[in-house]
Curated annotation (Swiss-Prot):
Pathway: Amino-acid biosynthesis; L-serine biosynthesis; L-serine from 3-phospho-D-glycerate: step 2/3; Cofactor biosynthesis; pyridoxine 5'-phosphate biosynthesis; pyridoxine 5'-phosphate from D-erythrose 4-phosphate: step 3/5
Protein name listed in UniProt: Phosphoserine aminotransferase
Cofactor stoichiometry and binding remark: Binds 1 pyridoxal phosphate per subunit.
Gene3D superfamilies membership: Aspartate Aminotransferase, domain 1, Type I PLP-dependent aspartate aminotransferase-like (Major domain)
Swiss-Prot/TrEMBL catalytic activity: O-phospho-L-serine + 2-oxoglutarate = 3-phosphooxypyruvate + L-glutamate; 4-(phosphooxy)-L-threonine + 2-oxoglutarate = (R)-3-hydroxy-2-oxo-4-phosphooxybutanoate + L-glutamate
Length: 368
């Protein structure tokens, strides 16, 4: 057993609230006095349908989702949504637009381009413009008014980039399709500004295995009949999310996280905590006299994924190793970026971030 508290800074699957894990432990063999473990429940049983209903309603309340939006709990991860969004929403359109701001939006653009006859245009490219050290301002996006949609990722986990204000387009422009996997429920935004939102659960929602999709009802009219039903949003909605067996346990766990968020005071309260956590780490980096380096423009720094390095690969490796020995786990940066990355999603307690900041200062004292 570790001498230190264990803090999980993984980018995903990520930390889950301790209270949620405790509830899941207590209900592992007997859910709510039913005698059934959730993992063994039929997805069509009244017991599970109640779990699904409450998860959907709690998410709708947390995000203030308007009535004309449908919520789905699907499988396949956010990467499947790169394809599903294009397959369902681009049908009959000559073009769709994509904004590339980092690793995952780049992959989304590439995948969308493969799966539809619609031309996927680059509305902006943060790599070409800023070497992924800043974000293309929304007002500079080259959006075609008659495009099917505009796809973007609001937070880039690999590069440590995040739009400070959640982007929205003016009336009459194409609907926004947004990958919110790594920041959904971390701050307030207006769902009505978007046509479709998707998010893999394993960062801010719950364990891996479920993907949340929030889609405006009128866009479902675009879904073509000649794509497989399993990839058709309308097929899932027409069957109340039961087209195939959903990820029952991941949905149950996500529902527990939604209840935990409500108990914390909702998204507005968790946003304030997230702001303080990010501030704690960035102040430590900026106050290190150059020992720690974060090259991202300050107004584009992510509050979810804080990337940094020492400028010495061997010292970075030593940092990751020594941090883990003190219970600060999974801080290694993404393979294409290197350095360190601290993912500080909703469930990461402020105490964990402060412990990391203390370790960073101590490490600098010893090796600076």
């Amino acid at each position: 057993m570790s001498l230190y508290p264990i803090y999980n800074f993984s980018a995903g699957p990520a930390v889950l609230p301790e209270a949620v894990l405790e509830t899941a432990r207590q209900e592992m063999l007997d859910y709510n006095g039913t005698g059934f473990p959730v993992m063994a429940m039929s997805h069509r049983s009244e017991m599970f349908l109640s779990i699904l209903h409450h998860a959907e309603q709690d998410l709708r309340q947390l995000l203030k989702v308007p009535d004309n939006y449908k919520i789905l709990f699907l499988q396949g991860g956010a990467t499947t949504q790169f394809n599903m969004a294009a397959m369902n929403l681009a049908h009959g359109f000559r073009t769709a637009d994509a904004v590339v701001t980092g690793n995952w939006s780049r992959i989304a653009y590439e995948q969308m381009s493969r799966l539809t006859d619609t031309e996927i245009r680059l509305a902006a490219h943060g790599g070409e413009q800023f070497d992924y050290l800043d974000l293309p301002p929304v007002e500079t996006w080259d959006v075609a008014p008659d495009s099917a949609f505009v796809h973007f990722a609001v937070n880039e986990t690999v590069n440590g980039l995040q739009y400070r204000e959640v982007p929205c387009l003016s009336e009459g422009m194409p609907p926004l399709v947004c990958d919110m996997s790594s920041e959904i429920l971390s701050r307030e935004f207006d769902v009505a500004d978007y046509g479709l939102i998707y998010a893999g659960a394993q960062k801010n929602i719950g364990p891996a295995g479920v993907t949340v999709v929030i889609v405006r009802e009128d866009l479902l009219e675009r879904c073509p009949n000649d794509i497989p039903d399993v990839f058709n949003y309308r097929s899932h909605i027409n069957r109340d999310g039961m087209y195939n067996t959903p990820s029952t346990y991941a949905i149950y766990m996500s529902g527990l996280v939604f209840r935990w968020l409500q108990a914390q005071g909702g998204v507005k309260k968790i946003e304030a905590v997230n702001r303080l956590k990010a501030q704690t780490l960035y102040e430590t980096i900026d106050g290190s006299d150059g020992f720690y380096i974060n090259r991202i423009r300050p107004n584009a720094r992510s509050k979810m994924n804080v990337v940094f390095q020492t400028g010495d690969e061997e010292l970075d490796r030593r940092f990751v190793l020594e941090a883990e020995l003190q219970g600060l786990c999974l801080l290694k940066g993404y393979k294409t970026v290197g350095g360190m990355r601290a993912s500080i999603y909703n469930a990461m307690p402020l105490e964990g971030v402060r412990a990391l900041a203390d370790f960073m200062r101590d490490f600098q004292r010893r090796y600076g």
